[in-house]
Amino acid sequence: MKVKPSVKQICEKCKVIRRNGRVMVICENPRHKQRQG
């Protein structure tokens, strides 16, 4: 899980979602998991 000030989709399988008021990227590639914060 990378924590970044701005999250972006890295590949076409990445999805930007909101969870508990946080913007996150989920992907089938675990290296692409990101959270804003």
From Swiss-Prot:
InterPro entries, per database record: Ribosomal_bL36 (IPR000473), Ribosomal_bL36_sp (IPR035977)
Gene Ontology cellular component terms for the protein in this record: cytoplasm; ribonucleoprotein complex; ribosome
Tagged with keyword Protein biosynthesis: no
Pfam families on file: Ribosomal_L36 (PF00444)
Key words of the record: Ribonucleoprotein, Ribosomal protein
Lineage: superkingdom: Bacteria
Cleaved signal peptide residues: none
Keyword Transmembrane included in the entry's annotation: no
Gene Ontology biological process terms, A to Z: translation
GO MF annotations, alphabetized: structural constituent of ribosome
NCBIfam families according to UniProt: rpmJ_bact (TIGR01022)
UniProt record similarity statement: Belongs to the bacterial ribosomal protein bL36 family.
Protein name: Large ribosomal subunit protein bL36A
UniProt organism field: Arthrobacter sp. (strain FB24)
